[in-house]
């Protein structure tokens, strides 16, 4: 039996403030650190021993991974970071409060911007200081590949080459792999693994720092998937995520 665990990062400062974050490199809150530590303890209690871990270039995911591995006493395992695992780029929405934006444009429009499969928010201009081409961490990425905005479809197209060529093939030699990333980048992986339709994927709400386990046969066929934790608590957390983009 082979396993891949997908984990969304713990609560970030802009999660707490209900802002569109995207590629903005905000830190974890104290609650987010505690969530990450709890996830690590839960994984350890359930006997997970990872062979390798993957994460994005954004500190909220990197620090979540560090907390998890520390609590599991597995700090030594190989870790690979990739910009391809970054969150969906929210264009010029980045930094705006979701509820205030919903009050201005309506819940339906904000839901489209947040979760539509193929509609992206307005793009950042080339001279916008938030444009990733100005950041040192992306210097080795061709400028044409760096997004100024993304739909979920765009995000999945960015992630899938890395998933198909790097992460998933490693399951041939590894027994357990951990991927710590973001709500939309993980949504893309889940859509691929479970063959979820474009229409249904927008309804999937991933809570912060709740391990999502995928079990595969030795032939790498998906056999089972489940969240680790109390089902009722997880349901409430999912509901809270769904309500983030609604006006108050």
Swiss-Prot record:
Record's protein name: 2,3-bisphosphoglycerate-dependent phosphoglycerate mutase
Superkingdom field: Bacteria
PANTHER family: PHOSPHOGLYCERATE MUTASE
Signal sequence interval, chain numbering: none
Marked site (Transition state stabilizer) residue numbers: 182
Alphabetical keyword list: Gluconeogenesis, Glycolysis, Isomerase
InterPro entries registered for this protein in UniProt: His_Pase_superF_clade-1, His_PPase_superfam, PG/BPGM_mutase_AS, Phosphogly_mut1
Listed GO biological process terms: gluconeogenesis; glycolytic process
Residues that coordinate or bind substrate: 8-15, 21-22, 60, 87-90, 98, 114-115, 183-184
